[in-house]
């Protein structure tokens, strides 16, 4: 009976092979003394690989309070799909939601379509880049704006020490067509070291840069985090 009940699952896996990998990086800082600081940083990633395609979703949440006053409150959610039509070339679809209300970015929704190139993909390293056209819907300081844009993305991983250590860099650059809006760059750079099969230490730098930010906001927002990562 148990063998028969397992047969449908085996057939499903054969028809629709799944290679799903997810991880969650967490960093929490609390300090007190002359001032009290609370910082929470969470990065979640999930990647599903198929025969000719790949789905990837990411979620970043970053908050900071100093003396009970919120000094950072950022949300960044992305989804991307790759459809390979050759061993190295692929079509790409991407969507991103970004919010940083303390910089008067009430929301930024980006929809992109384009093409990408897998520069290399080996057991020790991988690099891909893509270029596409985007539609950017923004609400800045309560004002709604809509603009076309050009998007350039990079995704790089390098493994060391029999894949126990990983260096990575991810970048998305938006060149927004609206006059005076300029470019928006988001990136994550970091190192991970495996402490066990499921847990690793994670050091990461997250950058948000705007050439022409809303009035009163800084161009650069750079966050460093040191925490633990869980793979599942």
Please state what every model-predicted region is.
Residues 124-175:
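Detector for outer-membrane/organellar transmembrane beta-barrel domains
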Residues 25-27, 43-45, 80, 114-119, ...:
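Outer-membrane beta-barrel architecture
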Residues 28-32, 50, 61-65, 97-101, ...:
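Transmembrane beta-strands of outer-membrane beta-barrel pores
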Residues 112, 220-232:
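Outer-membrane beta-barrel "beta-signal"
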Residues 26-28, 57-63, 77-81, 93-97, ...:
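Transmembrane beta-barrel strands of outer-membrane/channel proteins
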Residues 1-27, 31, 36, 41-45:
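Compositionally biased alpha-helical segments
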Residues 30-38, 66-72, 100-107, 140-146, ...:
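Solvent-exposed loop/turn segments connecting transmembrane beta-strands
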Residues 51-57, 88-91, 123-127, 159-167, ...:
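Repeated loop/turn-to-beta-strand initiation elements of outer-membrane beta-barrel proteins
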């Amino acid at each position: 009976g148990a063998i028969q009940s397992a047969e449908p699952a085996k057939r499903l896996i054969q028809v629709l092979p799944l290679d799903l990998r997810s991880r969650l990086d967490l960093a929490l800082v609390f300090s007190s003394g002359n001032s009290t600081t609370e910082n929470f940083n969470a990065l979640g990633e999930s990647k599903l690989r198929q025969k000719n395609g790949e789905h990837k979703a990411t979620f970043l949440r970053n908050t900071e309070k100093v003396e009970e006053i919120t000094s950072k409150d950022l949300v960044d959610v992305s989804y991307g799909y790759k459809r390979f039509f050759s061993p190295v070339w692929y079509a790409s679809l991407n969507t991103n939601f970004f919010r940083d209300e303390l910089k008067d970015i009430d929301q930024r929704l980006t929809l992109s379509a384009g093409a990408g190139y897998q520069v290399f993909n080996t057991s020790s390293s991988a690099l891909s880049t893509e270029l596409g056209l985007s539609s950017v819907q923004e609400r800045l300081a309560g004002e709604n704006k809509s603009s076309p844009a050009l998007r350039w993305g990079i995704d790089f991983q390098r493994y060391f020490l029999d894949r126990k250590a990983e260096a990575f860099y991810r970048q998305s650059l938006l060149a927004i067509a609206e006059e005076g809006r300029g470019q928006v760059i988001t990136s994550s750079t970091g190192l991970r070291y495996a402490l066990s099969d499921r847990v690793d230490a994670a050091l990461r730098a997250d950058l948000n840069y705007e050439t022409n930010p809303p009035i009163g906001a800084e161009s650069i927002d750079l966050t460093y985090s040191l925490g633990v990562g869980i793979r599942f």
